[in-house]
From Swiss-Prot:
UniProt keywords, alphabetically: Lysosome, Membrane, Transmembrane, Transmembrane helix, Transport
Disulfide cysteine pairs (residue numbers): none
Region (Disordered): 1-23
Name recorded for this polypeptide: Lysosomal dipeptide transporter MFSD1
Localization of this protein: Lysosome membrane
Length: 465
C-alpha cells in the first residue's frame, strides 16, 4: 500500500496542469508515459485498444483468403465451406444480447476482455487443428468458439474506449479502431495465400497439414490481441487506483420486452441492415474464386481485389463519419450507399469491365453506410431501449449472415456465380426498397432521421433552454 501511495503522490506532483505551464516536474514524479492523466499515456492505451481487435478481424476472413486451399485440402464443396462463416454467426445470434451484460454484471471489463480474447485464441487453435488432423467438423467447432469471443471482444473494445476517452475524442477513437480492424482484414487477405505457398514449399506438398499449419501461424495475431487485453487490464486497474476512476461499463440494459415497442422506422432500419450486409460479407467470403474464374486474375491479384473493400474502409470510415456528423441527412446518405452497392453488384454480374471499379465503389458505399445507418438507431428509440435495439440489430444481422452464407454456398454449387450475383442484387434491391419506405414513413411521421446537422443542433438547443 505504501508503494501505491508513493506512486500516486509522484503522479499527482507532476500533474497535467504543471506540465502544460512548462513548470519543472516535482522530484520523484513519473514520466508522462506512466501518468494515466496525461495524453501520452492515453495514446499508449489507444494503441493497445486498436490492436486488441486486430487478431479477431485478421482471422475472421482466413477462410476467404484460403478459399481454394480449404475446399481442395479438406475436400468440401462451397456449401460446407460457407458453414465456416455460418457457425461464427450462429454463436452470436443469442450472444449479442448478453455480451454487454456479461461485461457489466459478471466478469467486469478487464476479465471480460481477457476471457473473450481467450475464446478467440482457443477457437483459432481448434480451427487450425481441424486442418492438421483432417477433421472438418473440428474446424467448424473452432469457428463456433471463435465467434463466441469475436463479437463480444468488439463490445469490450468499445467499452474501454468510452472509459478512457470522452466527447469529441470518442468519435475519432471509434474511427481509428474501425480502421485498424479493416487493416487486419486487409493484411489477412493479402498474406495468408502467400504464407500457405511458403509452408507448402517447406513441407514439399499441399494438403490439410499445410493448411492447418498456415492457420496456426495466422493465430499468432490472436495471441497478440490477448497480450493487449492483459496489458489493458493492468493499465486500467492502475489508472483506477491512481485516479480513482470507475471501471468501464457498457451501460447496456437489455430487456426483450422492449421489442414489442419498437417503431416501424426501427424495423425498417433492421431490414436495411440485414439485406445490405448479407450481400457484402458472404460475397467477400466467396470473392477470391469469383475474380479468378470470371476475370482470369492470379491468386495473389484476386486476393488483392477482394480485400479492396477493407482497404478503402480503413481510411474512409473516419472521413465519412465526420461528413455525416457535419451534414446530417442520414437517410439520403444511406440511400446513396445502398444504390451505389446495387450498381457495383450489377457491374460485377453483367459486365466484363475492370472489377477494380466496382470493388472500389463497393468499398466507398460500405464505409458510408456504416457511418450513416447505425447512428439512426439512437434517433428512433428512447435511450433506455438503446441496448436492446443495438443487441437485436446485431442479433438479426448475424442470423441473416448465418442463413444467407449457407444459401450462397448452395446457389454457387448448383447454379454458379452469375445466379449468386443475381441473388445478391435481389438482397440489395430489398434493402433499397426499405430505405425508400423509411424515407416516406419518416416524412409522414415528421421524424428526425433526415434532419440536417443544423436542424438537430437547433432542436437540441431549444430543449436545453
Amino acid at each position: 500500500m505504501e508503494e501505491e501511495d508513493e506512486e500516486a503522490r509522484a503522479l499527482l506532483a507532476g500533474g497535467p496542469d504543471e506540465a502544460d505551464r512548462g513548470a519543472p516536474a516535482a522530484p520523484g514524479a513519473l514520466p508522462a508515459l506512466c501518468d494515466p492523466s496525461r495524453l501520452v499515456h492515453r495514446l499508449l492505451v489507444l494503441l493497445l485498444m486498436c490492436f486488441l481487435g486486430f487478431g479477431s478481424y485478421f482471422c475472421y476472413d482466413n477462410p476467404a483468403a484460403l478459399q481454394t486451399q480449404v475446399k481442395r485440402d479438406m475436400q468440401v464443396n462451397t456449401t460446407k465451406f460457407m458453414l465456416l462463416y455460418a457457425w461464427y454467426s450462429w454463436s452470436n445470434v443469442v450472444l449479442c444480447f448478453f455480451g454487454g451484460f456479461l461485461i457489466d454484471r459478471v466478469f467486469g471489463i478487464r476479465w471480460g476482455t481477457i476471457i473473450f480474447s481467450c475464446f478467440v485464441c482457443i477457437g483459432q487453435v481448434v480451427f487450425a487443428l481441424g486442418g492438421i488432423f483432417n477433421a472438418f467438423w473440428l474446424m467448424e467447432f473452432g469457428r463456433f468458439v471463435f465467434g463466441i469471443g469475436g463479437e463480444s471482444l468488439a463490445v469490450a473494445q468499445n467499452t474501454y474506449a468510452v472509459s478512457w476517452f470522452k466527447g469529441k475524442e470518442l468519435n475519432l477513437v471509434f474511427g481509428l479502431q474501425l480502421s485498424m480492424a479493416r487493416i487486419g482484414s486487409t493484411v489477412n487477405m493479402n498474406l495468408m495465400g502467400w504464407l500457405y505457398s511458403k509452408i507448402e514449399a517447406l513441407l514439399g506438398s499441399a494438403g490439410h497439414t499445410t493448411l492447418g499449419i498456415t492457420l496456426m501461424i495466422g493465430g499468432v495475431t490472436c495471441i497478440l490481441s490477448l497480450i493487449c487485453a492483459l496489458a489493458l487490464a493492468y493499465l486500467d486497474q492502475r489508472a483506477e487506483r491512481i485516479l480513482h476512476k470507475e471501471q468501464g461499463k457498457t451501460g447496456e440494459v437489455i430487456k426483450l420486452t422492449d421489442v414489442k415497442d419498437f417503431s416501424l422506422p426501427l424495423w425498417l432500419i433492421f431490414i436495411i441492415c440485414v439485406c445490405y450486409y448479407v450481400a457484402v460479407f458472404p460475397f467477400i467470403g466467396l470473392g477470391k474464386v469469383f475474380f479468378t474464374e470470371k476475370f482470369g486474375f492470379s491468386s495473389q491479384a484476386a486476393s488483392a481485389i477482394n480485400s479492396v473493400v477493407y482497404v478503402i474502409s480503413a481510411p474512409m470510415s473516419p472521413v465519412f463519419g465526420l461528413l455525416v456528423d457535419k451534414t446530417g441527412k442520414n437517410i439520403i446518405w444511406v440511400l446513396c450507399a445502398v444504390a451505389a452497392t446495387l450498381v457495383s453488384h450489377m457491374m460485377l454480374a453483367f459486365t466484363m469491365w475492370n472489377p477494380w471499379i466496382a470493388m472500389c465503389l463497393l468499398g466507398l458505399s460500405y464505409s458510408l453506410l456504416a457511418c450513416a445507418l447505425w447512428p439512426m438507431v439512437a434517433f428512433v428509440v428512447p435511450e433506455h431501449q438503446l441496448g436492446t435495439a443495438h443487441g437485436f440489430m446485431q442479433s438479426i444481422q448475424n442470423l441473416g449472415l448465418a442463413i444467407i452464407s449457407i444459401i450462397a454456398g448452395m446457389i454457387l454449387d448448383s447454379r454458379g456465380y452469375l445466379f449468386l450475383e443475381v441473388f445478391f442484387i435481389a438482397c440489395v434491391s430489398l434493402s433499397l426498397l426499405s430505405v425508400v419506405l423509411l424515407y416516406l414513413v419518416n416524412r409522414a411521421q415528421g421524424g428526425n432521421l433526415n434532419y440536417s446537422a443544423r436542424q438537430r443542433e437547433e432542436i437540441k438547443f431549444s430543449h436545453t433552454e
